[in-house]
């Protein structure tokens, strides 16, 4: 006795709706005997497969402060590969000893006997002088700073709030 499988729709590809019905039927064969036992015509069994239901629960939503990396419409909640260990006051870090390209003066400059600075490649002797011009208020790197278009929006909101408070105070004085 052999079995054949038939499927609703094309049998070479998966259906697009996620469900498929398979019907298995028995086909009698004559294998040498005249004793053919008649079998019922029709399906022996039906197997119906259905795709699992999709979740209808809450989905991810992004706050306004989430960064849109590279203006590509993709928002990220994490910033990769940035680690800033906590330091005690006065403790130096390896980034402090590196030269800072944002300063306009030479950190390696030492006062010579004639009062002129020399920028030779000799090792430093004594403590390094800290310059106030290099201390920035925001110690954020490029990944931690807001993109320029977001900074402009924030500044515009602040200005609008400042101007509205000025108008309100002028209206109060004129009444």
UniProtKB/Swiss-Prot annotation:
Regulator of type 1 phosphatases which maintains protein phosphatase activity under strict control. It is found in: Nucleus. Residues 32-42 have a biased composition (Acidic residues). Residues 150-161 have a biased composition (Basic residues). It comes from Coprinopsis cinerea (strain Okayama-7 / 130 / ATCC MYA-4618 / FGSC 9003) (Inky cap fungus). This is Type 1 phosphatases regulator YPI1. Transmembrane segments: none annotated. Residues 102-112 have a biased composition (Basic and acidic residues). Keywords: Nucleus. GO terms for cellular component: nucleus. Coiled coil: none annotated. Residues 16-29 have a biased composition (Polar residues). Disulfide bonds: none annotated. It holds the Pfam family PPI_Ypi1. Belongs to the YPI1 family. GO terms for molecular function: protein phosphatase 1 binding; protein serine/threonine phosphatase inhibitor activity. Residues 1-15 have a biased composition (Low complexity). The keyword Nucleus applies. Residues 1-74, 88-175 are annotated as: Disordered. InterPro entries: PPI_Ypi1 (IPR011107).
